[in-house]
Amino acid sequence: MAAIVERAPSLEFPILTGVSAGAINIAHLAAYRGSLAAAVDALRREWGRLTADRVYRISPMRLARTGLRWLGAMAFRRHGGPGMVRGLMDMEPLRRFLARSLDLRGIDENIAAGRLRAVAISATPYASDQTVTFVQGAEDVPTWRRALRYSLRTHLTLDHVMASAAIPILFPAVRVNDQFYGDGSVRQTAPFAPAIHLGARALVLISSRPDPETPRVPRASVRAQRERQYPSLAEVMGMLLHTAFLDAPEADAERLERINRLLEACPAGSGAPDGLKPIHLLVLRPSQDLGSLVAAQRVRLPPLVRWVVRGMGGEREAAAGFLSYLLFDPAYTTALIDLGYADAHREWSRIERFLRVTGGT
């Protein structure tokens, strides 16, 4: 984003949607009082300040207490009450950090000024089998209800942001009104849908999954493959988290491109079925496997987290995916930002063509 707004300083995104860590990003962009270019610059600085102790808190006592509660729940079939397990880590440091850096009152101001049409944050209610998208926008912004997903108009608060970023098991659920919510990626089968419902006709997907041709950190080392080592818990957790967070956007992108091709094939004047319209899509991918960046920064995990991760088999090469969900360090985030910046400049001709076709520049 920094490279894009540097070359297209007047660019604005009137519709912003996000889940998980993306909810933090779009909340910042939607609430910032100023241009998109200034908002992106400020967001870049905030990520540069983020450290593990500003995201989560974990201690030997908390780990021991959590383990005892799990054992007690299994032994005595206690599944509720004040002593129940609420996550391995405490997210209160992240709440305090965001409370100081986010002023969500700016969303209403940007909507009133016409810089923003709508912002949407999705979260997963644990008492339901549906994904809920919380929407704040102009008065004529629609709501929707579809199979397994629906929207609610609201004024977004820090609770909505925290709920969308609460990775199950690792972090406690967050209460919003009368329900407890977790990470919005968990059940989101159509991540592009909120933006399309809100009227978007052009989408930008910034993926953390590299091109299939890009060399990657191996799923298992050569030695592990030779010895046929059983996959470690960290490898399994990494696979599950990647499935929840990365697979759905990729599948939705393929589905959208297929629909666009079908619409192009419709005879002129015949009208598109179901009122469908083509949606322009730009997918930006990193030029290298992010797992290689994780491996270089593994030592920067907090000592207790590093000890736990080692016990889960996190020292294996293929566990880098799991570690990326725990690694918050300026050196790592700066490396990610620098990679994205360089990649966007490298891809600028494609980005510029997309902006020109969609009226973004």
PLM features: residue spans?
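Patatin-like phospholipase
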Residues: 1-86, 92, 98, 137-150, ...
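Extended hydrophobic secondary-structure segments that form protein cores and membrane-embedded regions
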Residues: 15-20, 118-123, 281-285
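Short secondary-structure boundary segments
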Residues: 28, 207, 286-288
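C-terminal helical/tail subdomains of lipid-metabolizing enzymes
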Residues: 85, 98, 261-361
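Active-site periphery "cap/insert" segments of enzyme catalytic domains
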Residues: 85-123, 132
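Glycine-rich, charged/polar anion/phosphate-binding loops
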Residues: 105-106, 187-192, 259-271
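Active-site gating loop/helix substructures
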Residues: 112-240, 318-327
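Acidic, Ser/Thr-rich peripheral helices and adjacent loops at domain boundaries
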Residues: 217-261, 304-307
